[in-house]
Amino acid sequence: MSQALSRADMPEFEPREPVDARARPGIDRPLRMLMPSYRSNPTTGGQGVYMRLITKALADRGHEIDVVSGQPYPVLDPRCRLIKLPSLDLYADPHPIKALWSGKIRDWLDVKEWWWHNSGGFPEPYTFGERMAKWAETRVNDYDIVHDNQTLCWGLLKMRDMGMPVLGTIHHPFTRDCRIDIKHSPNPFFAFL
């Protein structure tokens, strides 16, 4: 049986006058932007370098930029504000397993981050997103837009559901990288790890 609606079942919409987006109030003013990045190393990888360059370019255009980041923190233009969301930063720790007993653990999210990391997972995007969503609960109206820098975290959906407009930048296709790794794996067993 077809799931398609017949014309009789389709809702009717009243025609609207076209709206010139340039005429909307507030559209032609500097934006208050929140730019998340779960880690923003200023010298290696691309996220910290991208964050420094894009926020400087946006500040040059007159926008008000806040960057919310986990460690390592980015180096930003002085016109941009850095909001630090501390994590366990287990990738910088030569003995991450010891973090459980070192007094670093503050809450259950830290326990989850520690467990997930030490069992071979990659918890940073998830745990950063949870911390950021909690931080954002009292700041829903502080920003015109949240421009995600590839955190791809669930916390962004929570922020969207709070009423914050969210958009994202993805720098490269992870799935393509995975397919290439699997195709060129010397051992079929390692292709599934």
PLM region descriptions:
Residues R61-I65, Y143:
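A generic structural motif
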Residues N149-W154:
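Short, solvent-exposed amphipathic helices
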Residues M33, I145-D148, R160-R179:
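Active-site proximal beta-strand in glycosyltransferases
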Residues A92-P96, R176-K183:
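Short, charged, surface-exposed secondary-structure boundary motifs
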Residues S2-R7, P11-E12, E17-L31, D66-R131, ...:
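A conserved catalytic-core segment of Leloir-type glycosyltransferases
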Residues S37, S69-Q71, I170:
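Short beta-strand/turn micro-motifs composed of small residues
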Residues Q47-L58:
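Short amphipathic alpha-helix
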Residues K134-E137, F174, S185-L193:
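Membrane-proximal helix-turn-helix segments that form the acceptor-binding/catalytic region
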